[in-house]
Structures are given as structure tokens and as C-alpha cells.
């Protein structure tokens, strides 16, 4: 069980605009990579259609992550195929709960605010980077892998405008894992890292398993933010 933490928005227009800007700044993603799927319909809000497309982001290790991106039909012609083309996406990492098998499943994707096609990928490019400023909403889970690697799992609540929040799973390694182990629910935390995809096997019953893909933030840097900074962001 986790708690929802929401920062109150200002009632006046100027204050509302400032708060919206701050909330947008607290969830920033850039992914660059090859388009590896066509668009599939997701949903519609106030007449604006949203579609999903997959981007293949390479890692330094020559492996890769397939990142789902949600794009408005107003940003791109979603009836066209861009498979094989290189795309740069700026946006936010968002979550929603999908009800299935009598449970809620957390579904994550990059919500595109800006998209542009690029000619080539430079080796020095930051092809997959994310910054989050949110609140610890579940007790951190620290453990060691069978090979002795230290890991800590965090769930970060990141505020959106109008009282909504995104719940982002984050994984810390080594020294960061030992540091994050002691974080408390409700503390404000800043995280830098990358979005990674991870395959796992879901046991459906005694005889059947299903391959699924989880998405999470692999943390390269994190810090707790002081109360003074928290108050400053609310004012």
C-alpha cells in the first residue's frame, strides 16, 4: 500500500501557471532511438487522439531498451509508418492503473510533448535520460542478488497539474541502494537516471507462465531535498 502526496495548486491564474510550470519541470524525459513499431490507438480526450509507438534506445553495453511512447495525433501524422527512422522525444514519464485479472497493473509510458526526427545518433548523445522530483510513497526494499549485487527498489510519487500523480518504480544500485534503504515515506527525493525495460515471467496459474515487460528508472544519482526546498516549491 502506498500513499498519495499532492501539492496544492494556487487559486489565482498567475499562481496556477507557476505551479504548472514547476510540476512539468519535476518530470523530464528525453529518449532518442529507432522507431520499431507503427502507431496503435490508445485513447481520446476532448477530441484529441493519443497513440502508442515503440522506440528502441541503445545502451552503452550494446544492449537496448524498447520504450513505449504516447504521442498526440496533433504532433505527428499517426497514419504514416516511421519504422526505421530516428526520433527524439522530449516529455514526461507517466503511469496509470489498468485493471486486469482482478488486480490493478501499473502501466508506464513516455508522454511526448515534443518530437523531432534526427539524421543520425551521435555516440556522445544522451539517448535516454530522465529527471524526477517526487515523494517516497512506499517503504524502500533493499536486497542482494544471488551474485551479491546490492539493489533498492523505490516507488516515487511525482505530482502532475490538477491534483494528479504518477507513480514511478525506481531501482538503485550499490552505494545508492544503501543510501536509499533508509529513505522514509513522505520524504522528497530528486532522481537522475534512465528508463529501462526488463523482461520477466508472470505465473498465471500452476501450468501457465507469460513473458511480460516491466519498465522502471535505473538510478544513477539521487538526493533527498531539504524541507526549505520543499517549502520554496509550494510557495
Task: Give the predicted meaning of each segment.
Residues 2-7, 12-235:
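Single-stranded nucleic acid-binding surfaces, predominantly the OB-fold ssDNA-binding core
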Amino acid at each position: 500500500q502506498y500513499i498519495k502526496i499532492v501539492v496544492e495548486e494556487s487559486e489565482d491564474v498567475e499562481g496556477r501557471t507557476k505551479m504548472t510550470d514547476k510540476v512539468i519541470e519535476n518530470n523530464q524525459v528525453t529518449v532518442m532511438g529507432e522507431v520499431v513499431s507503427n502507431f496503435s490507438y490508445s485513447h481520446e480526450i476532448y477530441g484529441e487522439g493519443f497513440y502508442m509507438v515503440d522506440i528502441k534506445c541503445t545502451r552503452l553495453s550494446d544492449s537496448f531498451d524498447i520504450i513505449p511512447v504516447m504521442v498526440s495525433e496533433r504532433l505527428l501524422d499517426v497514419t504514416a509508418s516511421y519504422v526505421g527512422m530516428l526520433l527524439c522525444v522530449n516529455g514526461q514519464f507517466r503511469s496509470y492503473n489498468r485493471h486486469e485479472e482482478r488486480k490493478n497493473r501499473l502501466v508506464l509510458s513516455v508522454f511526448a510533448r515534443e518530437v523531432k526526427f534526427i539524421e543520425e545518433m551521435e555516440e556522445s548523445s544522451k539517448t535516454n535520460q530522465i529527471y524526477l522530483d517526487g515523494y517516497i510513497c512506499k517503504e524502500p526494499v533493499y536486497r542482494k542478488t544471488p551474485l551479491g549485487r546490492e539493489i533498492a527498489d523505490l516507488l516515487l510519487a511525482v505530482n502532475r497539474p490538477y491534483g494528479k500523480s504518477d507513480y514511478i518504480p525506481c531501482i538503485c544500485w550499490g552505494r545508492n541502494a544503501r543510501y536509499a534503504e533508509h529513505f522514509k515515506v513522505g520524504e522528497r527525493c530528486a532522481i537522475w537516471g534512465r528508463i529501462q525495460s526488463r523482461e520477466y515471467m508472470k505465473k498465471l496459474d500452476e501450468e501457465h507462465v507469460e513473458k511480460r515487460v516491466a519498465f522502471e528508472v535505473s538510478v544513477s544519482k539521487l538526493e533527498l531535498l531539504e524541507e526549505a526546498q520543499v517549502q520554496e516549491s509550494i510557495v
